[in-house]
Design a protein with these regions (language model features):
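Eukaryotic phosphotyrosine signaling hubs
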Residues: 92-96
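Vicinal oxygen chelate
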Residues: 1-4, 13, 36, 68-70, ...
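Glycan-recognition patch characteristic of GH18 chitinases/ENGases
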Residues: 86-88
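Acidic/polar N-terminal loop/beta-strand segments that form early-domain functional surfaces
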Residues: 63, 73-75
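Acetyl-CoA-dependent GNAT
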Residues: 75-78, 147
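A short, acidic/glycine-rich surface segment
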Residues: 42-46, 79-84, 150-154
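Core segments of cupin and vicinal oxygen chelate
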Residues: 14-67, 106, 113, 123-125, ...
């Protein structure tokens, strides 16, 4: 059995502290190539901000090994905070981000050695593949999955 993810260009991640979050994503996910990194008003976000135009800092960052990208976004006109609603798997939106690795066990050891907030040990996915779950600095959940479709031989454990 196999799986394919279709239609996701990149994953936007809202964080309260842009600098520390990006540092974590560089360290654990290899997101070290900025495509842009800027601060600007965000008029398209008014549906999420009760009609108010806010300013935000955003960086689109890329992992050169696997080609995945994420947009790290942090408001600058207010301090971001977690929702008062406790979301559950199956609610609207993306609940778990997914990151590829060439070796799940080596990735797990890297995350453990570097004191990441591991949510599981290495376990079997529904597809019978090794996987594990981790939380980032802002308690967002990520699943680390095996893959062999990488663009380069970059030495980072994830891609």
């Amino acid at each position: 059995m196999s799986y394919t993810i279709h239609g996701i260009q990149h994953l936007g991640v809202g964080v309260p502290n842009h600098e520390s979050a990006w540092k974590w994503y560089r360290k654990f996910f290899g997101m070290d190539i900025p495509l842009f990194n800027d601060e600007a008003e965000a008029p398209l976000m008014t549906i999420y901000t009760k009609g108010k135009v806010i300013s935000k800092r955003a960086a689109m960052v890329l992992n050169i090994k696997g080609g995945c990208a994420m947009e790290v976004v942090s408001p600058t006109t207010f301090k971001a905070s977690n929702s008062e609603t406790e979301f559950q798997l199956g609610d609207l939106g993306i609940f778990v981000g997914m990151i590829k690795t060439t070796d799940v066990n080596k990735a797990y050891d890297f995350f453990k050695t570097n004191n990441a907030k591991l949510l599981s040990t290495v376990l079997k996915s529904n597809y019978g593949q090794d996987t594990f779950y981790v939380k980032d600095l802002d308690d967002l959940i990520w699943q680390i999955l095996p893959a062999n479709d990488f663009y380069t031989n970059h030495n980072h454990i994830t891609g």
